[in-house]
Amino acid sequence: MPVQTIASKRVAHSRRGAVAVEFAITAPIFFLFLLAAFEFGWLNVVRHTADNAAYEAARTVMVPGASAAEATAKATSVLNVIGARGAKINITPSNITNSTTEVTVAIDIPMSSNGLITPRFTGKTTLHSESTLKTERAN
């Protein structure tokens, strides 16, 4: 059995509690990065869903006989999959006729009301998605 010297006992004794102090310093920083990663991951989910909603709404309204209300309903349906709140959907032109050559669907989603954990990381960011398609009724 090895014999401990007085110097080695002092070193072992002076390190007591060091792990707890190091954990207390590093854990909040680690969890802050972890929460930020979740929040920015969610921001990407919302952004991609908004892109998809704008595209799907434009596809819905590009066919003859479709209306802006149908495009709004389609975009809302896609955004409801993730529970997006406060989205503003704008269809241009608002009155779609047989002479309409292209349609644009724009969606704005405020991240302040759509944060996963806390809106502190995204602040007043507003995600903007837009899709423009030629209509099938154009000559």
Model-derived regions, located:
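Short, conserved structural patches
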Residues: 2-5, 59-139
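Alpha-helical assembly-interface signal, strongest on the long, hydrophobic N-terminal helix that forms
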Residues: 2-76
